[in-house]
Regions:
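HotDog/MaoC-like acyl-thioester-processing domains
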Residues: 1-18, 80-81, 86-151, 240-311
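Hot-dog-fold acyl-thioester-processing enzymes
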Residues: 1-67, 121-233, 295-311
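Hydrophobic beta-strand-centered segment that forms part of the acyl-chain substrate-binding groove
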Residues: 48-98, 206-255, 282-285, 289
Length: 311
């Protein structure tokens, strides 16, 4: 019987966000903050898990994965430092350019599900399917000033260097990350003898998330706070990859959807990444969820909004 999927080993991702701060307070990745919100520990940031899929996707899609790859994931269960997780990828038909991916803990708990594929004509991803089912939402409190279609009023210049501290949101350097990355690769390294086929080091897929988020959001993306946020869904799509270390890029952001559940309010932010020739090289979709319980006075404000609408 032919094998239906391939997988990596059980690996233990390392937490680098213990000291993360935003809006003047610590994040969910701090043990004390996580405990105060009822979580069993400070979770590993979701994008950390993306690196474990790279060897599998390189095996399936070859070097084209680094040029036009797309990884699209729905985070289902948190992972805590010390836990081991394994990445899986379904083996697609020979003609297919997209496949299913997932990650599990040692006890079988599913950490994430999603899809991965290559371009240039990207097929419908798992998040495309998820977004098509979103219902219209109203009575938002934390995101009352965030609307679908809202475009950022700023364009940011961003880059990642080996020893560049990425700020309060990501209090570490690329060199720090490479010392603990779950799946090392010589193409990420600074040493000349380890240079990639492109002649210079490439940015790991998980660090593209850092590249597009370390500067924060445009000033007109106004989220009420203090409030605690976390990644719920994420997609990174390359059109002209890979992205390179020490290369400057321009990014623009746009809200393409808002939604909510019983516990969170969320926005879906698309970041467009342009190279120095103003060519679109990547898109990064982040569904950021904000915990209602972490915003003081949430219920009172909700009643006020609901009451004014009912009148």
């Amino acid at each position: 019987m032919d094998k239906e999927f391939i997988n990596g080993d059980f690996l233990s991702p390392i937490q680098l966000l213990n000291n993360q701060k935003y809006d003047g307070h610590k994040s969910l990745h701090d043990e004390e903050m996580a405990d105060s919100l009822g979580f069993s520990g400070a979770p590993i940031e979701g994008c950390t898990h993306l690196s474990q899929f790279v060897p599998l996707l390189e095996e399936i899609f070859k070097d084209e994965w680094f040029v036009s790859g797309c990884i699209s994931v729905h985070y289902k269960n948190m992972v805590f430092e010390g836990e081991r997780v394994k990445a899986f990828a379904k083996l697609p038909d020979e003609e297919s350019k997209i496949t299913d991916i997932w990650m599990e803990k040692e006890d079988g708990t599913v950490v994430l599900t999603g899809s991965a594929g290559i371009g240039p004509n990207h097929q419908t991803s798992s998040l495309d399917n998820l977004m098509s089912k979103l219902d219209k939402t109203e009575n938002l409190v934390i995101l009352s000033e965030i609307n679908e279609g809202l475009e950022g009023n700023e364009r940011f210049t961003v880059k990642i260097g080996f020893d560049q501290h990425m700020g309060d949101l990501y209090p570490f350097t690329l060199r720090n990350k490479l010392s603990v990355i779950t799946e090392p690769m010589t193409w990420y390294n600074e040493a000349e003898e380890n240079s990639s086929p492109w002649g210079r080091p490439i940015i790991p897929i998980e660090m593209i998330s850092v590249l597009t988020n370390y500067v924060g959001n445009p000033s007109n993306f106004k989220v009420k706070g203090p409030v605690i946020g976390l990644f719920a869904n994420q997609e990174i799509k390359l059109f002209k990859g890979p992205l390179f270390v020490n290369e400057e890029y321009q990014i623009e952001k746009k809200i393409i959807a808002v939604s909510q559940s019983k516990r969170v309010e969320t926005y879906w932010c698309m970041t467009y990444v342009y190279d120095q020739n103003k060519i679109l090289v990547a898109e990064c979709l982040l569904n950021q969820a904000f915990l209602k319980d972490s915003y003081e006075g949430y219920e009172e404000e909700l009643k006020s909004i609901s009451g004014s609408i009912n009148i």
